């Protein structure tokens, strides 16, 4: 018997229904939420991501603001654009689409964002607030993972969660989210230096694969009935491919497809962060 699908698209649609109502209430009170994006260059993947985010905005009634810049812009020009959005009253929250061209400092750009307009939840100040468990915009992908598990009644409290990948956007903040008292999971954070990874994953109730290595998590690494969340994305023969081997579906109890699992929720919680920032004003 195959695993239950952790359907990110259906869950996203549920979130959008709620967001549309909340945006309507904000509009009635004279507060219109606005999401801005800064896109530098013409990377096809980045362009597609940005188009998708603005399409999502239209579905729930959030105002879209775009700042598309040429690939050869100077740091000063990028900084001016960030400062303009920091001061723009129509912009509730915004993101700098990554990756940036190599001559631009991504960390410096992210740090220049007003933490109160950090739609991605990745500003150093807001990551620090996550460590301290104080209110702040939460990183979108980790938040989406937790929501998806809850939506399908996968037990989190007391569960052993093995997270593969220590990146700033997923692995590190996910561990912080899952160990809050509201989640109460025990987290093992694995990476390229982890010895005997399979021994650890076979002990897990929940596995989150977020390394970007195609099909690296195989069926023999998964305990029967475990929940598996596939976050990593690679291109193989021109097609998007996740970190989880197809055979895992025959062993696991729940699996998120990739694409179609966590990705839609990352975008949904980007909008959620913007709506929440508007509600707090």
UniProtKB/Swiss-Prot annotation:
Keywords: Amino-acid biosynthesis, Histidine biosynthesis, Hydrolase, Methionine biosynthesis, Multifunctional enzyme, NADP, One-carbon metabolism, Oxidoreductase, Purine biosynthesis. Its EC number is 1.5.1.5, 3.5.4.9. It catalyses: (6R)-5,10-methylene-5,6,7,8-tetrahydrofolate + NADP(+) = (6R)-5,10-methenyltetrahydrofolate + NADPH; (6R)-5,10-methenyltetrahydrofolate + H2O = (6R)-10-formyltetrahydrofolate + H(+). Pathway: One-carbon metabolism; tetrahydrofolate interconversion. It comes from the Bacteria. GO terms for biological process: L-histidine biosynthetic process; methionine biosynthetic process; purine nucleotide biosynthetic process; tetrahydrofolate interconversion. GO terms for cellular component: cytosol. GO terms for molecular function: methenyltetrahydrofolate cyclohydrolase activity; methylenetetrahydrofolate dehydrogenase (NADP+) activity. Gene3D superfamilies: Leucine Dehydrogenase, chain A, domain 1, NAD(P)-binding Rossmann-like Domain. Pfam families: THF_DHG_CYH, THF_DHG_CYH_C. NADP(+) binds at residues 165-167, 192, 233. SUPFAM superfamilies: Aminoacid dehydrogenase-like, N-terminal domain, NAD(P)-binding Rossmann-fold domains. Homodimer. NCBIfam families: PRK14193.1. Belongs to the tetrahydrofolate dehydrogenase/cyclohydrolase family. Catalyzes the oxidation of 5,10-methylenetetrahydrofolate to 5,10-methenyltetrahydrofolate and then the hydrolysis of 5,10-methenyltetrahydrofolate to 10-formyltetrahydrofolate. This is Bifunctional protein FolD. It comes from Mycobacterium ulcerans (strain Agy99).
């Amino acid at each position: 018997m195959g695993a239950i699908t952790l359907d990110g698209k259906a869950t996203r649609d549920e979130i959008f229904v709620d967001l549309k109502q909340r945006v309507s209430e904000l509009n009635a009170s004279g507060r219109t939420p606005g999401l801005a994006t800064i896109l530098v260059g013409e990377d096809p993947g980045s362009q597609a991501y940005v188009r998708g985010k603005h399409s999502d905005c239209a579905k729930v009634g959030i105002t879209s603001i775009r700042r598309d810049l040429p690939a050869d812009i100077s740091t000063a020009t990028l900084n001016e654009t960030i400062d303009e959005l920091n001061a723009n009253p129509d912009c509730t929250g915004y993101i700098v689409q990554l990756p940036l061209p190599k001559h631009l400092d991504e960390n410096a750009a992210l740090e220049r964002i007003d933490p109160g307009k950090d739609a991605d939840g990745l500003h150093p100040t807001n990551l620090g607030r996550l460590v301290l468990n104080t209110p702040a915009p939460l990183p979108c992908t980790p938040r989406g993972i937790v929501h998806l598990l809850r939506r399908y009644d996968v037990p989190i409290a007391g569960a052993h969660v093995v997270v593969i990948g220590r990146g700033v956007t997923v692995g590190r903040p996910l561990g912080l989210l899952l160990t809050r008292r509201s989640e109460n999971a025990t987290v093992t954070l694995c990476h390229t230096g982890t010895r005997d990874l399979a021994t650890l994953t076979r002990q897990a109730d929940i596995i989150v694969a977020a390394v970007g290595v195609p099909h690296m998590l195989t069926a023999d690494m998964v305990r029967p009935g475990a929940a598996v969340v596939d976050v990593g994305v690679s291109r193989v023969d021109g097609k998007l491919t996740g970190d989880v081997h197809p055979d895992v579906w025959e062993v696991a109890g729940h699996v998120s497809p990739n694409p179609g699992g966590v990705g839609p929720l990352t975008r949904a919680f980007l909008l959620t962060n913007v709506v929440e920032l508007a509600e707090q004003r």
